[in-house]
């Protein structure tokens, strides 16, 4: 959703605290402690201002796609292995997201809180799996998770199919790929050149 290194996230958290947009406190986490960040009223105001701005366009950071661009410099075995690894990563990320959804659906979880009208604004925050919950936000969280899981499922499907296809290639520079290349490009054009259903053709 927003790729970034752990170091960058840590610096951003400190910056938010420095701006007065969040507070931080240590809390027990087993035998150790962890930092819990809480948004402040000033932070909520800044968040509302940001949400009123025009969003940036989508950005992709999928190394498997980059490797496809330069696949003619690789052997078929390396290419296929890269495709399989990318599919496996997408599959693992999808499974992790589904696990989160299952937690939301579990008895006593956020959806139960939402449906029973408990743990919302103005009430004591209820915890689930050791974390405070915000059931009143679940409708927008569900939309975000829907987008993420669909994208991950598409990535898994595409890279799995691509690995199966490239596994049968004699080489990555074989002229025999030419007819399939035409079929693929024509299929892309046919699939996406027509106007969306909400936009009638002229």
Language-model region placement:
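Conserved beta-strand segments that form the floor/walls of ligand-binding pockets within enzyme
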Residues: 38, 69, 144
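Charged, low-complexity intrinsically disordered regulatory/assembly segments
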Residues: 83, 100-202
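Histidine kinase transmitter module recognition
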Residues: 1, 86-89, 151
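Basic helix-turn-helix/winged-helix DNA-binding cores
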Residues: 1-60
């Amino acid at each position: 959703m927003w790729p970034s290194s752990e170091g960058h996230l840590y610096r951003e958290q400190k910056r938010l605290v420095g701006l007065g947009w969040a507070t931080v406190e240590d809390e027990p986490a087993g035998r150790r402690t962890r930092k819990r960040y809480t948004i402040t009223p000033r932070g909520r105001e800044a968040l509302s201002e940001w949400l009123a701005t025009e969003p940036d366009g989508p950005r992709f950071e999928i190394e498997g796609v980059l490797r496809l661009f330069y696949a003619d410099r690789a052997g078929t075995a390396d290419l296929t292995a890269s495709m399989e690894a990318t599919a496996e990563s997408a599959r693992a990320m999808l499974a992790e997201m589904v696990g989160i959804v299952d937690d939301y659906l579990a008895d006593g979880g956020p959806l139960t809180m939402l449906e029973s009208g408990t743990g919302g604004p103005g009430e004591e925050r209820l915890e689930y799996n050791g974390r405070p919950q915000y059931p009143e936000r679940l409708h927008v969280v569900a939309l975000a998770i829907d987008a993420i899981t669909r994208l991950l499922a598409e990535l898994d499907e595409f890279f799995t199919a691509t690995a199966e296809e490239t596994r049968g290639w004699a080489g990555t520079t074989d002229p025999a790929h030419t007819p399939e290349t035409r079929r693929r490009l024509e299929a892309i054009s046919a699939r996406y050149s027509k106007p969306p259903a909400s936009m009638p053709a002229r």
